[in-house]
A protein has these predicted regions:
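Conserved catalytic core of the tyrosine transesterase superfamily
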Residues: 1-287
Length: 287
């Protein structure tokens, strides 16, 4: 039987008009926390239980700091909004996130991965990540009506932060979409472009990830540190390398802050092989 607090959390999320992805993550996390408590009533749990849950996520489940922090935010929302019970946040620290540079595919690797994706559905999903800069959740939730072949653009509805935006629809991706349509012709009341295995709802994140991982394996591309988000990072980095201005990329990516986009400047500079100024003032004698 579902705990009544989950219905309250759902209502509170919908009143705040949070995006669908936030709703799904918060509800799954709250249910997971209730399972973690076991027989202990939610009302009897306190900060020590939330701390134990945080350690469990990091140490036992080996989740990344960013994921742990998202889960903690969901649990705190359940307590502070759902139960109207303030928590001592000093006792529930969020994890520091390492500032790692985003990994990107080289253009040669991207060509190999796309060529290795034998299923047209997987190929077009990979193309949407790399060619249009879509997040994996945005690929899953893409609707047929979002594809504007006349203006050559995609409408991303209810993206991260519950924001809508337009992004590029490359000619090669449109050709793949048409090929995909000829094979699958998805028909769903909600208009999802990519359906799940039983046709009830849209495709899952895990199915899209599988398509990319299989294509990388067949292409012989190193998978370590690479995910579907790497396609999006490669989209931004390669646009910068080609001279696209930062504000345009920010808009295409759906970033709320320019600093989020500026991270890719450093990656693009490294990829360009930026020369050190010392090379212009002194030449090594061994050259």
């Amino acid at each position: 039987m579902q705990h009544p607090i989950l219905a309250k959390v759902l209502s509170d999320i919908e009143l705040r008009n949070h995006g669908g992805a936030t709703k799904d993550v918060y509800l799954r996390t709250c249910a997971r926390y209730l399972d973690f408590l076991g027989d202990k009533p939610l009302e009897a749990a306190d900060e020590s239980d939330v701390r134990a849950f945080s350690r469990h996520l990091r140490c036992d489940c080996c989740l990344a700091p960013k994921t742990v922090n998202t889960y903690l935010a969901a649990v705190l929302f359940m307590y502070e909004v759902g139960l109207d019970r303030p928590m001592n946040r000093r006792q529930i620290p969020f994890m520091r996130k390492p500032k790692a540079m985003p990994k990107v595919f080289s253009r040669e690797e991207m060509a190999a991965v796309l060529a290795a994706a034998e299923n047209v559905k997987h190929r077009v999903q990979i193309s949407l990540g790399y060619g249009s800069g879509l997040r994996i959740s945005e690929v899953c939730r893409l609707r047929v009506r979002d594809v504007d072949s006349e203006a050559m653009r995609l409408l991303v509805e209810d993206g991260k932060g519950a924001k809508d935006r337009y992004t590029l629809l490359p000619a090669t991706t449109l050709a793949l979409l048409r090929e995909y349509w000829e094979v699958y012709r998805p028909n769903h009341a909600e208009g999802w472009l990519f359906l799940g295995p039983y046709g009830y709802t849209h495709v899952t994140d895990s199915a899209v990830r599988y398509g990319l991982s299989e294509a990388m394996r067949k292409a012989g591309v190193e998978p370590a540190g690479r995910s579907f988000h790497t396609l999006r990072a490669s989209f931004a980095t390669h646009l910068l390398e080609d001279g696209t201005d930062l504000m345009t990329i920010k808009s295409l990516m759906g970033h709320s802050s320019l600093s989020s986009t500026a991270v890719y400047l450093h990656v693009a500079d490294m990829a360009r092989g930026v020369a050190s100024p010392v090379d212009s003032v002194m030449a090594p004698s061994w050259l």
